[in-house]
A protein has these predicted regions:
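N-terminal periplasmic accessory domains that precede
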Residues: 9-13, 28, 33-55, 67
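Gram-negative outer-membrane beta-barrel transporters
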Residues: 375-377, 396-397, 402-495
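Transmembrane beta-barrel strands of outer-membrane/channel proteins
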Residues: 56-62, 82-88, 129-135, 176-182, ...
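Surface-exposed extracellular loop regions of Gram-negative outer-membrane beta-barrel proteins
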Residues: 137, 184, 238-246, 292, ...
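Transmembrane beta-barrel wall of Gram-negative outer-membrane proteins
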Residues: 61-86, 100-137, 152-180, 220-223
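Short acidic/polar hinge/loop motifs at secondary-structure boundaries
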Residues: 2-25
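Outer-membrane beta-barrel signature, preferentially recognizing the C-terminal barrel domain
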Residues: 149-167, 255-261, 322-379, 397-423, ...
Length: 607
């Protein structure tokens, strides 16, 4: 379980393809074995490692490097797999990033590691141990005539899983797992003015999960596959730890106590095949405990598929799901900040109901086409109240007063949401030319009595249009050309209409310039207009690549020439407001991380 499934807020996949054996994306028709979330599920299986001989792959490029190694620990009985990657766009692309970001100095990099070991205990027993560690780093520096400003964002996941696989009999298998997961976010802000006055803010937040699960698969006959099991997780939330310094006059060190919650679930599901029909009925019962409050929620699931002909199939599904962890997202301009908080006695868990239907058809020459539609309702979603933030809790900046670890509840409000749309996907899998074209038309709206005068508005991640085109052309056995184009409607954000200084939330003077962190931490009193009434510019880009492979006696060498963002689109990562030297006029600025970036890489796969 990971809390941030992407690098750089969705620009890169969190998962290294070199370490994966299979990936399954579940967008609808959720099986009962999945719980705890309202949205799509990505089910990953890592490579087990070669238990016969040592093998691997090493890639070195201008913007990133990667490596994967696998081999036997005890030949024929146990094996290992380890992989890692690291980008260094921040170093090589710095001049391009500064030009695209209107002079601001911004940079980003990430690194991650995957490892797995497995051991065959007996003919019926296997033991697996796997782990993941990943970290993202983003920085933004800006100098004006009067001030110097620096901010650093860091966030990361790490997981560790031990799994025992046991064959009870030829028709029944069991998996018992112990799971640890950690997520943390840190933000550092430092500002100096011409008089050497300093403002410094350090913020950290983290979650630790300790869980166990047991899954049992039973196939009584070829038509049925019954799955059942249970899981329980202890979530330990550390909502925030803050160090605040304003000059030499004020020093605040706040650390909230840990919030312990317990989430459990038991499920049963069946895969039933009958001629042209496939049925997938199931139910999950979820249970959640926080302090002295308990929630017990049934979650019925049902999906089906019907093969009209060999080349045409239709499907439909219904799922009710509950989520006991809330994601609080910033809504205005500035750095995108997402904070995880638990359901409590006063903040109820989210619940959704989703209906989906679709049709798929296979054509000649390897073409396939699918069309799907969905409708989802959501209850008890939360957002910040107007002008609120995680730090503006009662007495938060008074060192003499203790702060309750649930004081943030006063800064949020609960409401409803709706999400609906349709997707079309055309794919070609055979021949010299392969690839796909995908398009999604969707709407996501929210409504809160205490926000936007109770009027519905579009959610931050409402994306009206989302399109992707991927083409792979095999010129020969040695040469392959590729092209990717993506497009997405910009995020909906709230644009400030005006600003007031000296709110009294800080005990001394405020920072002299407005900066991206002010939106995140609300260091100014902001006059907001309608919620999420402004759209960031659309995100789109084209990437091209050319690969040349050459087989050697002990492996394959690959040279790749690629260009990221071919037409040099300045896609916005975030906006911020900048005061002029006189401090009287604000200008909206844009930070772009990745303009056009050419790259050359070399990969060697040995076997």
């Amino acid at each position: 379980i990971v809390y941030n499934a992407n690098h750089l807020f969705g620009f890169f996949s969190l998962f290294n393809g070199d370490a994966l054996r299979s990936v399954e994306l579940v967008k609808g028709g959720f099986p009962s074995r999945y719980g705890g979330r309202l949205s799509s599920v990505i089910d990953l299986n890592m490579k087990e490692g070669n238990n016969k001989k040592f093998a691997g792959e090493v890639g070195i490029g201008l913007i990133s490097s990667r490596a994967v190694f696998e081999g036997p620990i005890v030949k024929g009985k146990s094996s290992f797999m380890i992989s890692g990657r690291r980008t260094y766009l921040d170093a090589l692309a710095q001049p391009l990033i500064m030009a695209a970001s209107q002079g601001a100095n911004a940079g980003y990099f990430f690194y991650d590691f995957n490892a797995k070991a497995n051991y065959i205990l007996s003919e019926k027993d296997k033991l697996y141990v796997s782990g993941y560690f990943g970290r993202d780093k983003f920085y933004f520096n800006q100098n004006t005539a009067n001030t110097k400003f620096k901010t650093n964002f860091g966030w990361g996941n790490r997981t560790l899983t031990a799994r025992w696989n046991h064959q009870i009999n030829p028709k029944m298998f069991a998996n018992a797992s112990a799971i640890y997961s950690h997520y943390d976010l840190s933000i550092n802000v430092l500002q100096k003015d011409a008089n050497s006055d300093e403002f410094e803010l350090k913020y950290t937040s983290n979650i630790n999960d300790y869980g166990v699960k047991y899954d049992l698969d039973y196939r009584p006959n070829p038509k049925h596959m019954v799955r059942t099991g249970f899981s329980t997780i202890n979530h330990q939330f550390s909502p925030s730890a803050i160090v605040l310094k304003v000059g030499t006059n004020f020093n605040l060190d706040r650390k909230m106590s840990v919030i312990n919650t317990y989430e459990s679930g038991v499920y049963i599901e069946d895969q039933w095949r009958e001629r042209k029909w496939n049925f997938y009925p199931g139910v999950r019962i979820s249970h959640y405990v926080v302090d002295k409050t308990q929630y017990l929620k049934p979650e019925p699931r049902m999906s089906f598929a019907y093969n009209v002909r060999k080349d045409i199939a239709i499907k439909g599904s219904y799922a009710l799901m509950n989520q006991y962890i809330h994601l609080l997202s910033s809504t205005g301009i500035g750095l995108p900040t997402d904070l995880w908080v638990p359901a409590t006695t006063n903040v109820k868990p989210m619940q959704s109901q989703q209906w989906a239907t679709g049709i798929a058809k296979d054509f000649k020459k390897g073409f396939s086409l699918s069309l799907e539609g969905y409708y989802k309702t959501m209850n008890h979603v939360i957002t910040y109240k107007e002008g609120a933030s995680f730090l503006l809790q009662d007495n938060f900046f008074d060192p003499s007063v203790s702060v309750n670890n649930k004081a943030w509840e006063s800064q949020v409000t609960s409401g409803r949401g709706w999400s609906y749309g349709s997707e079309v996907f055309l794919q070609k899998q055979v021949g010299k030319l392969s690839g796909w074209v995908g398009y999604t038309l969707s709407w996501t709206q929210l409504q809160f009595d205490a926000v936007n005068n109770g009027i519905k508005y579009y959610a931050k991640y409402d994306r009206r249009h989302d399109a992707s085109v991927v083409c792979i052309y095999r010129l020969s056995k040695l040469f392959t050309a590729s092209m990717t184009w993506v497009y997405g409607t910009g995020n909906a954000i709230t644009m400030p209409q005006g600003y007031l200084r000296g709110t009294g939330h800080y005990p001394t003077t405020m920072p002299e310039i407005w900066d991206p962190s002010n939106q995140a931490f609300n260091n100014e009193m902001i006059d907001y207009g309608k919620r999420n009434s402004f759209r960031m510019a659309a995100y789109h880009r084209m990437d091209i690549g050319l690969q040349f492979k050459k087989e050697k006696a002990h492996g394959i060498k690959t040279w790749e020439l690629s260009v990221y963002n071919v037409y040099n689109r300045f896609n916005p990562f975030f906006y911020y407001g900048q005061l002029n030297d006189a401090g009287t006029i604000r200008t909206l600025k844009q930070v772009t991380l990745f303009p056009i970036i050419p790259s050359l890489s070399w990969t060697y796969k040995f076997r």
